[in-house]
Amino acid sequence: MEQITRSSLLIQKMVTGAPVVNLFKQWNIVCEQIPFPKTETKDLPTHDYSSKNGEDAYIPSFIPIKAYDLAISFYYTGDLDSCYTNIFKGFIAYLQGTPPVNDNYDSITEGGFRIYDRHNMIGRQKVYLKSFDPENLVHISGDSIQFKLTFRVSDPSTDIVLTDPNVKVTL
């Protein structure tokens, strides 16, 4: 049985036929920390009467969950001067997607991606890159960089599972 490690993060663009990408196999990127997402419900309509204790709240039978930010810590190590090509021109460019070629909204496909953490067995869809924070870039007999990415999870409740392609894929 294959050992599942913290590096077992899979990503798939939300485009029909897009390949599943294993970050370690594709770009030699290891996930150092993937926290469990904080679950917070949406605010309910309330009215706070000054003459009464507490508040008057409408509590429905189903309380929806808010979208949330997910900050993941990564580590990359590779050949000398490979960081720019693999991280910035490779991985980050993959997450950003490609700009539309024109303003014809019928030709623009949905952006974002699916993400699956095999260690915690949590998968979400409609995820997009929110910020990139490089922490340490070291050039000693190769490149090493620690960085954090913050993702926005706009669909906090749909569970998805992605299967590891076990190989580097063509993007």
Kindly label every feature range from the protein language model.
Residues 1-171:
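Extracellular/virion structural assembly segments
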